Amino acid sequence: MARILNVEIPNNKRVIISLTYVYGIGRSLSKQILAEANIDENIRVKDLSEEDLTKIRNIASRFTTEGDLRREIQLNIKRLMEIKSYRGIRHRKGLPVRGQVTQKNARTRKGPRKTVAGKKGK
């Protein structure tokens, strides 16, 4: 298995797909990296030369990926919560952040239903 940005990428898959195993590199960024390195995107990782892998590593290292990207996202969310913006408050309460309706749905974000005991015998 080849190692790019401290991530083992699978040998038997196409390069464009294998690069997406790195957090922060999707299909479009993968395509961009391969175009800049002049490498065919349909070639398998096991067929790449060490020189090609070095090119990919050098180009990919310029982007924010893996731990740095995760840390940056966490700091952005933390900043939103500290300045008490609407989005920060929604993050803090564990509710949907992007304007979704929560009256009936949003179970993924809210978690399982919390049943409230009703009054017995009216």
From Swiss-Prot:
UniProt GO cellular component terms: cytosol; small ribosomal subunit
Keyword Oxidoreductase: no
Superkingdom: Bacteria
SUPFAM superfamilies assigned: S13-like H2TH domain (SSF46946)
Region (Disordered): 94-122
Keywords: Ribonucleoprotein, Ribosomal protein, RNA-binding, rRNA-binding, tRNA-binding
GO MF annotation terms: rRNA binding; structural constituent of ribosome; tRNA binding
InterPro entries on file: Rbsml_uS13_C, Ribosomal_uS13, Ribosomal_uS13-like_H2TH, Ribosomal_uS13_bac-type, Ribosomal_uS13_CS
Keyword DNA repair found: no
Compositionally biased tracts (Basic residues): 106-122
Oligomeric and partner information: Part of the 30S ribosomal subunit. Forms a loose heterodimer with protein S19. Forms two bridges to the 50S subunit in the 70S ribosome.
Functional note: Located at the top of the head of the 30S subunit, it contacts several helices of the 16S rRNA. In the 70S ribosome it contacts the 23S rRNA (bridge B1a) and protein L5 of the 50S subunit (bridge B1b), connecting the 2 subunits; these bridges are implicated in subunit movement. Contacts the tRNAs in the A and P-sites.
Family: Belongs to the universal ribosomal protein uS13 family.
PANTHER family for this protein: 30S RIBOSOMAL PROTEIN S13/40S RIBOSOMAL PROTEIN S18, SMALL RIBOSOMAL SUBUNIT PROTEIN US13M
HAMAP family named among the record's database cross-references: Ribosomal_uS13
Protein name in the entry: Small ribosomal subunit protein uS13
UniProt organism field: Mycoplasma mobile (strain ATCC 43663 / 163K / NCTC 11711) (Mesomycoplasma mobile)
Taxonomy of the source species: Bacteria, Bacillati, Mycoplasmatota, Mycoplasmoidales, Metamycoplasmataceae
